[in-house]
């Protein structure tokens, strides 16, 4: 046990911190925990040896998993929380397929208007479904807004004295600003699947079927 004032403000569970400072939707991220999931980019949990190798060499080798596409119909009722959508995805997937088609695969979430925190709620949950990784496909405007949120949170960390000698946090803000400019100019839109992308399975979640709060 340590006193609260011995920790920097904005210090948080590591996955949450990493999500707040992730500014590249095209990034491939690995971390030494199954809950290494982000709202931007695709993040894999890996064993400690793989993570150590990546830190030492900048490279890592792993098999490329199949993907499962998740789309949504209907609309959220006023009384619904986004966690209800997450739980409904699991419930309806199991009803549609009779088995966990997420296991060992990359879940590709198609709600283009999910801001960073909601997207992280979804991707982090996929670890509980034994998915290898997950990614949220964003619309350009939504991604820009999520990047602005990231810039704001990184600036708070800077203001609280959390910057290092290499000015990493300042450089992350610069990367976010560059990415926003690329999206606005059309030079590099938000990451999206190819038109001919193939999936191991396609799950359709009907939001209209969620008529009461759900718990895990």
Report each predicted region and the residues it spans.
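Fe-S-dependent hydro-lyases/dehydratases of central metabolism
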Residues: 2-216
């Amino acid at each position: 046990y340590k006193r609260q004032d011995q920790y920097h403000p904005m210090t948080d569970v590591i996955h949450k911190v990493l999500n707040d400072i992730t500014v590249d939707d095209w990034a491939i991220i690995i971390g030494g925990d199954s809950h290494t999931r982000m709202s931007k980019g695709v993040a894999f949990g890996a064993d400690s040896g793989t993570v150590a190798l990546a830190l030492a060499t900048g490279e890592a080798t792993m098999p490329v998993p199949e993907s499962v596409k998740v789309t949504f119909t209907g609309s959220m009722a006023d009384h619904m929380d986004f966690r209800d959508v997450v739980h409904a995805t699991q419930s309806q997937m199991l009803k549609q397929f009779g088995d966990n088609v997420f296991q060992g695969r990359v879940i590709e979430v198609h709600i283009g208007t999910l801001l960073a925190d909601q997207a992280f709620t979804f991707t982090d949950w996929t670890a509980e479904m034994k998915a290898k990784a997950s990614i949220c496909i964003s619309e350009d405007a939504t991604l820009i807004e999520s990047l602005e949120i990231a810039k704001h949170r990184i600036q708070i960390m800077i203001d609280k004295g959390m910057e290092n000698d290499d000015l990493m946090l300042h450089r992350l803000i610069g990367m976010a600003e560059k990415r926003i400019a690329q999206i606005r100019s059309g030079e590099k839109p938000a990451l999206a699947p190819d038109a001919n992308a193939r999936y191991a399975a396609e799950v359709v979640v009907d939001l209209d079927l969620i008529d009461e709060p759900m718990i895990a």
